[in-house]
């Protein structure tokens, strides 16, 4: 059971960092500045995190966990990749404001870290049952290709002001991913 005070403090720190990321690059944000924005002292900050980057990683991890949670709910059988990709896209859109603030001045915070590794593992588990090969190295690179492409497309969408509808973007992403996987998909029995 997690102490509610800890949850509130960590949430406050993360929200304060998101607000600061809307103003400047993550590399320019200090612990002191973040603590002041969160209205806590540095000692309290260090009770929860070691660095500003740790907070960024925690934010990304929360977003990816939300994405994966949506995708898991979309397909209880775990074998409908299209549904899972649609729900991943939906979750990204639901986190749009938060992601926009982060991407505004610090686009480099996406595409690396434990959150992306979590997303890669999830995608690998999702596509493994429908693929027609057992080559682990090839699977690793295929997952890297799919996740990197997925992230890049959504980052570009955000950078271009979300001009296309989220539905059109989700359809395009599904088409790209399924096209990339089509050669490897096991025929249905």
Feature roles, as predicted:
Residues 1-7, 185-189:
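N-terminal intrinsically disordered/low-complexity leader segments
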Residues 29-30, 100-102, 111, 166:
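Short, hydrophobic secondary-structure boundary micro-motifs
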Residues 107-132, 137-152, 182:
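Amphipathic alpha-helical packing segments from all-alpha helical-bundle domains
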Residues 137-159, 164-180:
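Hydrophobic alpha-helical segments that form the core
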Residues 25-32, 39, 52, 131-138, ...:
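Short glycine/proline-centered loop/turn elements that form peptide/ligand docking sites
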Residues 10-18, 22, 27-28, 36-39, ...:
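An amphipathic alpha-helix adjacent to DNA-recognition modules
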Residues 2-6, 12, 34-56, 91-94, ...:
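Basic/polar phosphate-binding segments, predominantly the helix-turn-helix DNA-binding elements
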Residues 78-97, 144, 148, 152, ...:
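Amphipathic alpha-helical segments that line or abut small-molecule/effector binding pockets
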């Amino acid at each position: 059971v997690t102490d509610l005070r800890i949850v509130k403090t960590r949430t406050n720190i993360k929200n304060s960092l998101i607000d600061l990321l809307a103003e400047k690059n993550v590399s320019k944000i200090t612990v002191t500045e973040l603590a002041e924005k969160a209205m806590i002292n540095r000692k309290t900050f260090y009770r929860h995190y070691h660095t500003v980057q740790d907070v960024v990683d925690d934010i990304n991890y929360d977003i990816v966990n939300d994405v994966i949670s949506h995708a898991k709910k979309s397909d209880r059988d775990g074998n409908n990749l299209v549904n899972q990709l649609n729900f991943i896209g939906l979750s990204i859109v639901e986190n749009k404001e938060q992601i926009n603030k982060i991407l505004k001045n610090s686009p480099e915070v996406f595409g690396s870290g434990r959150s992306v590794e979590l997303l890669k593992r999830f995608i690998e588990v999702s596509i493994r049952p429908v693929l027609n090969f057992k080559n682990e190295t090839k699977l690793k690179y295929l997952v890297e290709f799919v996740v990197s492409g997925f992230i890049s497309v959504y980052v570009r969408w955000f950078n271009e002001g979300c001009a296309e509808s989220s539905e059109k973007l989700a359809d395009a992403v599904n088409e790209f991913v399924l096209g990339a996987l089509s050669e490897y998909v096991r025929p249905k029995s």
